[in-house]
């Protein structure tokens, strides 16, 4: 899931985007839990996951708007 490019996301179907978002949300939950317990080493991964979710949601919205 790490470092998804916009072109890679655009090539995904809506179902694949939903699965990617779900996976990233689970990863983000685990990262937050690790941060709270002091086990998180790569703190920047939290920010990356949040931004990847936003990137996928934005492209999904653009695709839906283009269909109309």
Swiss-Prot record:
The name under which this protein is listed is Large ribosomal subunit protein uL29
Q: Which cysteines are joined by disulfide bonds?
A: none
Which of UniProt's keywords are assigned here?
Ribonucleoprotein, Ribosomal protein
**Can you provide one Gene Ontology molecular function annotated for this UniProt record?**
structural constituent of ribosome
Q: Which GO terms describe its cellular component?
A: cytosolic large ribosomal subunit
Family listed: Belongs to the universal ribosomal protein uL29 family.
Top-level taxon of origin: Bacteria
Entry's Gene Ontology BP terms? translation
Its gene name is rpmC
Q: Which Pfam families has this protein been placed in?
A: Ribosomal_L29
């Amino acid at each position: 899931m790490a470092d998804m490019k916009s072109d890679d996301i655009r090539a995904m179907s809506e179902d694949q985007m939903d699965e990617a978002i779900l996976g990233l949300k689970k990863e983000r939950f685990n990262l937050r839990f690790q941060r709270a317990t002091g086990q998180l080493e790569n703190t920047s991964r939290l920010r990356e996951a949040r931004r990847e979710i936003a990137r996928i949601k934005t492209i999904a919205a653009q695709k839906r708007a283009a269909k109309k």
